[in-house]
């Protein structure tokens, strides 16, 4: 018999210590990795529930196992909320991750060797949009598109590449692009050659849910997202579509199960359902509006302090600092800021002379600090501290001074009060 009072602390001290140390790290460090966020205790309650015990291969009402009457309710809630939130008429909530959602789209729409037009990873794209080290680059013929000299997506180049290479699918979306994407323009280009438009909105899904960023669902044939990042839910994936193409929906469902996955993670799907409900609340819209304001506030400080921001600003939750003129690498900046309890990630910048393991830039995102309650004043103060560290990257006294300020502001703005 399993006793409810069983716990990790009494049984596995080594594991518990690591878990507790991570909890402390999250509370005492400022998180600026654009893809990270803090999920709610309600989501964590769902993920720690007895739903983790249930196998449920198939879809609601069409399971391969018995005893699914209640997990059917859970999954249908998640499906219905996803459709309502994003204005879709199809949703699949089973993908274990954004990458697996993307894999399902590829396998549903394409054959190995088909040509795909995707954003260059070095200019803001994602691994699954055609990187040679990823399944997408290994299985498909990838033609990359990029950005122009102003740092914006070059739609003219995209249209020319589409006419020249006749891809079967064009991918919109990014992992390190600070602008607004013209989804309608991308659909126009796709339609001109009879291609699918597939949008990966993982980074901006929360902003889209709150009407802070344009929604691709009315324009794309298929849309995927993660459920964490700006959406602030559990780690997982989601596929959406609109337009009533039932054959397409069947292909997408089959590509997730049984093609790419077996049993869905019902405890995670419950977490998705909770997060999607939270995203419908008025305070979520206020949160996302503040995410955008905080990113802009930080950019203003970096520009005033003489730092180069790729594209000159941001229109979403993230931006890239180009450190080439500062004679700093992204790796050095990442490490120095880390010593001050400020977490970022090194990131390639356009025309980066350094390798992806070193880079010449860092990516900065505002979702997590905004979740803590930071507003423009705190965001600007933080950006100033970061400039102090980067201006004095080898001065440990400066770094220690900033670390003290970080600890103070973290105590004033706890993650979980």
From Swiss-Prot:
Catalytic activity line of the entry: (6R)-5,10-methylene-5,6,7,8-tetrahydrofolate + glycine + H2O = (6S)-5,6,7,8-tetrahydrofolate + L-serine
UniProt record, GO biological process: glycine biosynthetic process from serine; tetrahydrofolate interconversion
Annotated positions binding (6S)-5,6,7,8-tetrahydrofolate: 121, 125-127, 355-357
Residues under site feature: Plays an important role in substrate specificity: 228
Cofactor(s) listed: pyridoxal 5'-phosphate
Keywords: Amino-acid biosynthesis, Cytoplasm, One-carbon metabolism, Pyridoxal phosphate, Transferase
Residue positions where N6-(pyridoxal phosphate)lysine is found in the record: 229
Family annotation (InterPro entries): PyrdxlP-dep_Trfase, PyrdxlP-dep_Trfase_major, PyrdxlP-dep_Trfase_small, Ser_HO-MeTrfase, Ser_HO-MeTrfase-like, Ser_HO-MeTrfase_PLP_BS, SHMT-like_dom
GO cellular component: cytosol
GO MF term list: glycine hydroxymethyltransferase activity; pyridoxal phosphate binding
Enzyme Commission (EC) number: 2.1.2.1
Pathway membership, UniProt: One-carbon metabolism; tetrahydrofolate interconversion; Amino-acid biosynthesis; glycine biosynthesis; glycine from L-serine: step 1/1
Subunit organization: Homodimer.
Protein family (similarity comment): Belongs to the SHMT family.
Protein name: Serine hydroxymethyltransferase
Organism expressing this protein natively: Citrobacter koseri (strain ATCC BAA-895 / CDC 4225-83 / SGSC4696)
């Amino acid at each position: 018999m399993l006793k409810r009072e069983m716990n990790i602390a009494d049984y596995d001290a080594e594991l518990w210590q690591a878990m507790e140390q991570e909890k402390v790290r999250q509370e005492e460090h400022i998180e600026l990795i654009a893809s990270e966020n803090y999920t709610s205790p309600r989501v964590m309650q769902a993920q720690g529930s007895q739903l983790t015990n249930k196998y449920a291969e198939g879809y609601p009402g069409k399971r391969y196992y018995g005893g699914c009457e209640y997990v059917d309710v859970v999954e249908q809630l998640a499906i219905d909320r996803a459709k309502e939130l994003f204005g879709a008429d199809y949703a699949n909530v089973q993908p274990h991750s954004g990458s697996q959602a993307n894999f399902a789209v590829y396998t549903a729409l394409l054959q190995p060797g088909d040509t795909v037009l995707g954003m260059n990873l070095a200019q803001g794209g994602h691994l699954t949009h055609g990187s040679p080290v990823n399944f997408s680059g290994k299985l498909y013929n990838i033609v990359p598109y990029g950005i122009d000299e102003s740092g914006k997506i070059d739609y003219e180049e995209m249209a020319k590449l589409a006419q020249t290479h006749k891809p079967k699918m064009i991918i919109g979306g990014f992992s390190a692009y600070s602008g607004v994407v013209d989804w309608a323009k991308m659909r126009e280009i796709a339609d001109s050659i009879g291609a699918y438009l597939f949008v990966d909105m993982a980074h901006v899904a929360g902003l889209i849910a709150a009407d802070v960023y344009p929604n691709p669902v009315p324009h794309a044939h298929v849309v995927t997202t993660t459920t964490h990042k700006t959406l602030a839910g559990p780690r997982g994936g989601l596929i959406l579509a609109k337009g009533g193409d039932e054959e397409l929906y069947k292909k997408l469902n089959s590509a997730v199960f049984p093609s790419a996955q077996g049993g869905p993670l019902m405890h995670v799907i419950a977490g998705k359902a909770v997060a999607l409900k939270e995203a419908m609340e008025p305070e979520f819209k206020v949160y996302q509006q503040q995410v955008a304001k905080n990113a802009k506030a930080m950019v203003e400080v970096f520009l005033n302090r003489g730092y180069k921001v790729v594209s000159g600003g941001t229109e979403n939750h993230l931006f890239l600092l180009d450190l080439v003129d500062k004679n700093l690498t992204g790796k050095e900046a990442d490490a120095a800021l880390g010593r001050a309890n400020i977490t970022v990630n090194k990131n390639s910048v356009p025309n980066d002379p350094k390798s992806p393991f070193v880079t010449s830039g860092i990516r900065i995102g505002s979702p997590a600090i905004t979740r803590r309650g930071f507003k423009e004043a705190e965001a600007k103060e933080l950006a100033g501290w970061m400039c102090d560290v980067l201006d004095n990257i080898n001065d440990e006294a400066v770094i220690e001074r900033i670390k003290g300020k970080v600890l103070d502001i973290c105590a004033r703005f706890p993650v979980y009060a």
